[in-house]
Structures are given as C-alpha cells and as structure tokens.
C-alpha cells in the first residue's frame, strides 16, 4: 500500500464531532459527488476507489441524516480494473446538500467554501481532511522529492482550498493542470504540518522518521564526498611535489638548493605519505607550521617549473658546486 493510501486509511479511523463530520462530508461530496435526476428524484453518487473511505462516507451520512443510503460496488473495465465504490442517496438529497452548504436555493451550487461553515479551527481542519480524502496525494518520503497536493476541478474552489491551507501558514501554492487545478506543498516541514492539521499522526511520524534518516544519509554523503575530495587534493599535491623534487634532484641536485629548501625536499621524498603537519615536526632545524611547510614546497614547485621551462640554475637562484 502506498504512503498516500496508508495516510488516508489512518484518517478514516478518526473519531470526530457531528459538526466536524458535516464539514468533512461537505468537502468530500463537493469534490467527489455527482448529481443526477430521475423521476423527479435528485440522486447523489459519491464515488471512490478506496473501500475504507467509502465506508467512512457511508457511516458519516448514516450517523448524521436519517435517510436511506446505498453502497454499491462496480468494477472498472479500463486500465486498472479496480473496484469503484459508490455511496448513493436517492431521497433527502437536496436538503442534505443545502445543509452541507454545497447547494443554495433554488438549485445553485456554491463555487467556493462557505466561510461561516469553516469558521472554527477544527472545522478548517475537517474540511482539509475531507478534501485530502477526496482527491489528495502525497509522495512517499523515501522518494527523491517531497510533494503533497489536492486536486480540484474548479479554479475558485481550488483557490479557496489554498487560502484555507495558508491560514495555517503552509505556504501552499496553486497550479493549473490539464483537467483542473491543484493546491500543493513542496517543503517537507510544511507537509508534516499539514499531516498534523488533518490528524494523520502516524503518517506524520513515519514521514519525519524517513526524512530524518534521509537527511542524515545526505549529510554523511556530503561529508564523505568532501573528505574524499580533500584527500584526493592532498594526494595529488604530494605526487606533484615529489615529482618536482625528483626532477630538481636529477637535473641540478638537491645540494644546489638553499638549506631550508634542501631539508624539506629530502624529507618529502623520504616520507611520501606523511602530512604537512608531520613534515613540519620532522625538521631538525626547528618545528615549522603547516603553512610554512606548504610555502617551502610551493617554492620547490616554482623552481622545478622554471628549470623545465629552460631557465638556468643561476637564473633560478641556485648555486651549482664545481667540485
């Protein structure tokens, strides 16, 4: 089962007050309900592919309204042949839709969210929970990117959902899609806040556990990469230094070098694997800092390069013994 499905399953087990149940129902029906007319009856079908959600919608309607409710199961014939669950109302439909602020007399559908209906903070949470159950999705936190969205067919309703989410400082944004509009979150912290708002505590804890482990792995990888890069840099520098010192040795001899350069040159080729700090501690003329050792080795690099370019030892500042 996907992370989104697990989250929705958790939400279907929540106990809510009657007032919050109405708001949750209103959001779900507003987004997943369909109205049809037959023999002067107003028929409402609420459709979902999630059995747990269908049971919740059925139970909420049954608890709130004393009307006959049908629960139908159909099988999709195209693509994924999943079951489709339909909660159907054939009587009292109009009154229920008006009570849920989805329909206004005489038969006008509301385009947005009734502000009075979501005045209380718990009602705001309930509406977002219903909207997420209806058409929400959230990426598994183990995937490469964080993403949570709620889809709506109507732009005005989508904008209202975005505004409702941002009353909780979620920094939600909207985007037009091919068949409608979405309100979405991209920041991990905001996604966990949203999960907390709608009451998905277990999903939130799982999301945070995975996110923390993922961030730790990323930090370790960055540290390892940085240390590897520094190690490679150190090794390359040591190889270059030894190569240059051996070139000086083979062309003019180390004896031509000034004493302070001659000593470090001899130590470097005799101790290829030691650090600059360790080289500084080996000097018989007195301990020298890491930066001081680095300065002397750079001077040896410069001498080798000048000799390679054709300059004479005298031009480089070296004294060649005639004996």
Swiss-Prot record:
Gene3D superfamilies: Homing endonucleases (3.10.28.10). The keyword rRNA-binding does not apply. Pfam families: HTH_WhiA (PF02650), LAGLIDADG_WhiA (PF14527), WhiA_N (PF10298). PANTHER family: CELL DIVISION PROTEIN WHIA-RELATED. Involved in cell division and chromosome segregation. Belongs to the WhiA family. One of its GO terms (molecular function) is DNA binding. This is Probable cell division protein WhiA. It comes from the Bacteria. Residues 275-309 bind DNA. Keywords: Cell cycle, Cell division, DNA-binding. Signal peptide: none annotated. The keyword Magnesium does not apply. One of its GO terms (biological process) is cell division.
């Amino acid at each position: 089962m996907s992370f989104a499905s697990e989250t929705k399953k958790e939400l279907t087990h929540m106990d809510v007050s009657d007032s919050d149940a109405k708001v949750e129902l209103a959001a779900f029906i507003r987004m997943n309900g369909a109205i049809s007319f037959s023999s002067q009856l107003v028929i409402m079908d609420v459709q979902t592919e999630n059995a747990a959600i269908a049971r919740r919608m059925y139970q909420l309607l049954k608890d709130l309204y004393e009307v006959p409710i049908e629960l139908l199961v159909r099988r999709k014939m195209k693509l994924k042949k999943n079951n489709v669950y339909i909660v159907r109302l054939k009587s009292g439909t109009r009154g229920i839709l008006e009570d849920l602020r989805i329909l206004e007399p005489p038969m006008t559908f509301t385009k947005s969210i009734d502000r009075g209906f979501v005045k209380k903070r718990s009602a705001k949470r309930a509406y977002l929970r219903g909207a997420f159950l209806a058409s929400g999705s959230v990426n598994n936190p183990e995937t490469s990117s964080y993403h949570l969205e709620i889809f709506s067919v109507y732009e005005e309703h989508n904008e209202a959902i975005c505004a409702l989410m941002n009353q909780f400082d979620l920094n939600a944004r909207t985007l037009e899609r091919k068949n409608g509009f979405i309100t979405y979150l991209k920041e991990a912290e905001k996604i966990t806040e949203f999960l907390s708002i709608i009451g998905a505590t277990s999903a939130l804890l799982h999301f945070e556990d995975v996110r923390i482990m993922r961030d730790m792995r990323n930090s370790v990888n960055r540290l390892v990469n940085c240390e590897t890069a520094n190690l490679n840099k150190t090794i390359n520098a040591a190889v270059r230094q030894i190569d240059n010192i051996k070139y000086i040795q083979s062309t003019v001899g180390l004896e031509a070098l000034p004493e302070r350069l001659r000593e470090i040159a001899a130590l470097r080729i005799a101790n290829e694997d030691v650090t600059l700090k360790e080289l500084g501690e080996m000097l018989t003329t007195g301990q020298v800092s890491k930066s001081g050792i680095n300065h002397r080795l750079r001077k040896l690099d410069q001498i080798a390069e000048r000799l390679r370019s054709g300059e004479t030892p005298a031009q480089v500042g070296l004294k060649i013994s005639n004996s």
